[in-house]
């Protein structure tokens, strides 16, 4: 929203609304892009107001539900917050995949997840270096990318291919694929993913059956986001 929007909705004078918005930006709860202000995922630490304001669940949940119904696999959506991803919507399949329980507001390291790699690929190499420095990055399995140079190479492949495939880099037995939905205006990018059991679903099946479905869902989601302006 703009400063004028914030003043109108809150009933504050523009000067007071501006002070509050700039304070939120200083604290990391909001970002400013030209005339526009938007909340950041850090607001999740305070509650679910962030999700309501971004309207991500209302936009994304139907597509995640459709993916899970069509594929029989869990699907999720997340945004980038620093070096983490933050889950903003999920549609769980009956079978549990991960050792940890994930819900809205859960955080995972971006470099070790397909969601994170899909979102990091939307940044420039300099922006990625600024977030990670020289490393090494935390490792979770033998497949985790812990070298920032190798991470940049992976992200270049993600940009080229238009998707991120993660093969047991976060947790053994977990294979997932993600596609990003670019941000629009002050609204930041979001990524969709489908997660599978590596012993049950091969890489070939992920590419042949799952990737086309998630690409279509991401395209539909992008069109829905575009309607919001």
Positions of PLM-derived features:
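Short amphipathic alpha-helical/adjacent loop interface patches that line ligand
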Residues: 10, 21, 43, 64, ...
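Cysteine/selenocysteine-centered motifs that mediate thiol-based redox chemistry or coordinate metal-sulfur cofactors
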Residues: 127, 136-138, 215-229
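Extended hydrophobic
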Residues: 143, 147-220
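Residue-level recognition of specific faces of alpha-helices
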Residues: 23-29, 42, 76, 87, ...
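N-terminal helix-turn-helix
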Residues: 1-58, 219-227
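Amphipathic alpha-helical effector-binding/dimerization core
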Residues: 38-135
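A short, flexible beta-alpha/helix-coil linker loop
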Residues: 43-46, 137-138, 197-201
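A structural signal for short hydrophobic beta-strand segments in well-ordered beta-sheet cores
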Residues: 29-32, 77-78, 181
């Amino acid at each position: 929203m703009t400063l004028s929007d914030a003043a109108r909705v809150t009933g504050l004078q523009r000067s007071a609304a501006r002070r509050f918005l700039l304070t939120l930006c200083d604290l990391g709860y909001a970002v400013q892009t030209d005339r526009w202000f938007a909340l950041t995922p850090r607001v999740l630490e305070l509650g679910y107001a962030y999700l309501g304001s971004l309207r991500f669940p209302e936009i994304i949940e139907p597509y995640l539900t459709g993916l899970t119904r069509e594929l029989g696999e869990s699907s999720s959506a997340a945004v980038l917050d620093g070096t983490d991803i933050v889950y903003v919507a999920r549609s769980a399949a009956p079978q549990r995949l991960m050792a940890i329980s994930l819900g809205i507001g859960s955080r995972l390291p971006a470099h070790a997840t397909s969601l994170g790699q899909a979102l990091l690929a939307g940044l420039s190499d300099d922006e990625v270096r600024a977030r990670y420095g020289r490393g090494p990055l935390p490792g979770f399995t033998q497949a985790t990318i812990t070298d920032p140079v190798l991470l940049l190479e992976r992200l270049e492949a993600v940009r080229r291919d238009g998707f991120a495939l993660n093969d047991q880099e976060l947790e053994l037995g977990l294979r997932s694929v993600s596609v990003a939905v670019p941000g629009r205006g002050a609204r930041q990018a979001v990524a969709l993913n489908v997660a599978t059991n590596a012993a049950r679903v091969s890489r070939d099946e992920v590419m042949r059956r799952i990737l086309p479905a998630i690409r279509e869902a991401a395209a539909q989601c992008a069109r829905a986001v575009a309607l919001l302006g």
